[in-house]
Amino acid sequence: EPRDLELCSRLNLWHVVHNNEQIDWLAAHKTHQPHRVFLKLNSGMNRLGFAPQAYRSAWARLNALPQVDEISLVSHFSDADADRFGVSGITHQMLAWHAASADLPGERSIANSAATLRHAADTEVRGDWVRAGIMIYGGVPDHPEHDAAHWGLQPAMSLSSRLIATQQLAAGDSVGYGSAFVADAPLRIGIVACGYADGYPRHCPTGTPVLVNGVRTRTIGRVSMDMLAVDLSPVPDAGLGSEVTLWGRGPHGSVLPIDDVARAGGTIGYELMCALARRVPVRVA
């Protein structure tokens, strides 16, 4: 909004310009300090940005404004994590990027996490700035083709809880709503204080990986609002208060990649990181 420009000016915040209305706002803005902007090219993702044929005229408009001090060039890949129609997913957008910005001055930024990892040797892709998002948290942008170990990524975000109860099942006993899991033999289970109201994906089925005291095991039955159940067979010493790692770094050097949990739930690690409920206590270490 136009009023945001004053805040950007006072705090020296760089901001993205992606349409002509924003250039109009800048032209009308009485700024305290000149603005530093990223001019967005729509190179093929078709969300934000100027079309390639309009990019240079947008740059010229910005460059003529006394309110603008520095113009950097930016775009965003849609398919950097995979191939697109049988060729590298970035090919069509790099062609548009070159055509629209080849002789324009300014620092450049087009690489997201996937491009930063998969095209690390390409200086044109790396540009002057990379926008590393998911990889900063240890998530893998091209999972399941590659995992965190392949890229040398470490989790920076973990979700953990504890066992609040244990139950001993007999063969034929069921667990949770809808009796979605039925034991085919005697089985000891644990109840974890975490559920979909905390942001854990409700659609995670029986078999979703989880760590108990750093040992990998599985969820069983449906995820409830505030609780979920886990198989304690691999962790016979687990009991009330035992640590449970839903994703991330667990005790004794154990790690449960968030992408393993996301894949089981039919989603991606990005969504899990964004979906934690406000009621979940956050500790920054």
PLM features per residue range, with description:
Residues 2, 17-20, 49-52, 87-95, ...:
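Electropositive phosphate-/nucleotide-binding environments in soluble metabolic enzymes
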Residues 1-13, 17-26, 118:
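N-terminal active-site wall of soluble small-molecule enzyme domains
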Residues 14-15, 108, 127-129, 156, ...:
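A residue-level structural signature of the nucleotidyltransferase/glycosyltransferase Rossmann-like core
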Residues 8, 30-32, 66, 122-124, ...:
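Solvent-exposed alpha-helices and their adjacent loops that cap or buttress functional pockets
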Residues 23-36, 41-162, 166-170, 234:
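Active-site loop/helix belt of alpha/beta enzymes
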Residues 166-285:
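C-terminal accessory subdomain/extension
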Residues 12-14, 47, 229:
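Short aromatic/hydrophobic contact patches that present stacked aromatics
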Residues 10-21, 32-37, 109, 256-271, ...:
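Electropositive, surface-exposed helix/loop patches at the edges of structured domains
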